[in-house]
């Protein structure tokens, strides 16, 4: 599974959303999240991210390892909607992301 880490917070470029063939990248308030059950591990999202925020789970830098758990837990209440485009913006973030200081200040 791919993970979106800290460089995405408060940026949300969304190039990855356009590239994803299975519509598994969801938009939270401050960050984007990859649904671990819907992602097919194709990797199309990784090279198009202009801030290099997307990593394969095993390749996530040590300082951003907590983002894997945040990506998984973000979907605890949502379940598996089966496509991000029909949901649009989700007006919340994982508490780990929500608690970060503003990244674009």
Curated annotation (Swiss-Prot):
Binds 1 [4Fe-4S] cluster. [3Fe-4S] cluster binds at residues 8, 16, 49. It comes from the Bacteria. The keyword Electron transport applies. PROSITE patterns: 4FE4S_FER_1 (PS00198), 4FE4S_FER_2 (PS51379). Its cofactor is [4Fe-4S] cluster; [3Fe-4S] cluster. GO terms for molecular function: 3 iron, 4 sulfur cluster binding; 4 iron, 4 sulfur cluster binding; electron transfer activity; metal ion binding. Pfam families: Fer4 (PF00037). [4Fe-4S] cluster binds at residues 20, 39, 42, 45. Keywords: 3Fe-4S, 4Fe-4S, Electron transport, Iron, Iron-sulfur, Metal-binding, Repeat, Transport. Residues 30-59 form the 4Fe-4S ferredoxin-type domain. Ferredoxins are iron-sulfur proteins that transfer electrons in a wide variety of metabolic reactions. PANTHER family: FERREDOXIN, OXIDOREDUCTASE. This is Ferredoxin. It comes from Streptomyces griseus.
């Amino acid at each position: 599974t791919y993970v979106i880490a800290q460089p995405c917070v408060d940026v949300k470029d969304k190039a990855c959303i356009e590239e994803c063939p299975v519509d598994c990248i969801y938009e939270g308030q401050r960050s984007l999240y990859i649904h671990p059950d819907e992602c097919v591990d194709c990797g199309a999202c990784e090279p198009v991210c202009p801030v290099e925020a997307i990593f394969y789970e095993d390749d996530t830098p040590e300082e951003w390892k907590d983002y894997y758990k945040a990506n998984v837990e973000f979907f605890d209440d949502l379940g598996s909607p089966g496509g991000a485009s029909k949901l649009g913006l989700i007006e919340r973030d994982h508490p780990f992301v929500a608690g970060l200081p503003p990244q674009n200040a």
